Amino acid sequence: MLADAPGELAKLTEILKNEHINIEAMNIQDANEYLMALYECRSQTGRRVAPRDYYEAILKESAKYSMIRFITDNPDKAVDVLNSVGYKVKLENVIGLVLQNRPGLLNRVAKAFGDAGINIAYTYGAGFSDGVSALFIFKVSEMEKALEMFPNGIIE
């Protein structure tokens, strides 16, 4: 989590820069926005598991933070360094796939995961400056199975 305030990303990236750790991919999401969407989904289904006051307290607290996910060239060192200066960091296994930048390839990957019974917890991606390919990061329910499906990490 990252404090939702001006300059916080600069502080975090300064720490990584000073340790010669490169960020290769990153996603930042407003924690409050995410939780509000979840709250609204729960309202529609009627499956709230806690009193309304509990949800409202969490929403109020979440307004102070953003969720940040990033890939570095040295994840273990990044976790150690950031934890040592007070950030709460968790290492997660993800799979990175390079897709040719054309319609339908992300669908092919998503369909392959679904057909194999692999759930996608989250994904984020962006095109490379060459305009030919894009990198997508996936957090999936069955990492080993996903790696077997796409062993070279390139989808053409």
Where in this protein do the model-derived segments appear?
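A conserved regulatory-domain signal marking ACT and ACT-like small-molecule sensing domains
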Residues: 1-156
